[in-house]
Amino acid sequence: VELLKSSPATVRRDIVRLEEEGEVERYWGGIRRKETPENRRRNTLQSQEPDEAHAAIGRLAASRLHDNELIFIGSGTTTLEMIPYIQNSNIHVITNGIPQLEALHRKKIQALLLCGFFKEYSRSMVGKETVEMLRGYHFDQAFLGANGINDNLCLLSADEYEDEIKKLCILQSKSTYLMVGKEKFHRTAYYSVPGEISGEVTIITDYPEYQSPQWIEENGAYMCKISRLLGND
């Protein structure tokens, strides 16, 4: 109760609600997340070998790096794809993704994991503590994944925690790249980054979904600033 900063009644009410929604199950002395087909699907997706399209996105993202930069790499399977292609060992990386931290460590790249609550299915750190810690950094470049992109080219998030992290990274980075496969376009979600913020982001993808001469093709992938796709630049 002290850790959650909530009253016992609030905690009990939340547990009952989560149990009714099928998210958790009780056992003697506590609760645990209930194994569901959706959870198994997420875990399967995250353990699959990456395909060539996502590898191309990763190569192009890694090619944007420069020595001595402070970089943010967000959680997610697509952002993880850039790490094997990083050639700059003297960069400094902040991340909220545990797989990202492990991959950076194997490359002997200096990395720091943000603190916060552990989000199991994405193996990431999220929450108020994560956001507050993030406020202390200003990045040369940030590389983010997303739950999707809607028809207005706004970045979508699965929950409020991811949404806050995306907004803050965009605002506190000189350059921000969104790494998404073509399957992420034309989606909807409750949480979206406002257009005036999303417009500053450069998409890196495996297919130029929106017809525009602004797309730049490199290393088998495509990139373009969102504001240019919208005709605002």
Q: Where is each model-derived feature located?
A:
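HTH-adjacent hinge/linker in prokaryotic transcriptional regulators
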Residues: E2-K5, A9-S75, I83-N88, H92, ...
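Conserved phosphate- and dinucleotide-binding cores of soluble alpha/beta proteins
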Residues: K5, E102-D233
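Alpha-helix capping/helix-boundary segments
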Residues: T10, R17, T77-T79, P99-Q100, ...
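A generic structural-conservation signal
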Residues: Y27-W28, T95, L113, K225
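Residues at secondary-structure transition points
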Residues: Q48-E52, A56, T77, T95, ...
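Short, contiguous clusters of charged residues that form electrostatic/catalytic patches at enzyme active sites
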Residues: E52-R59, S63, L80, K128, ...
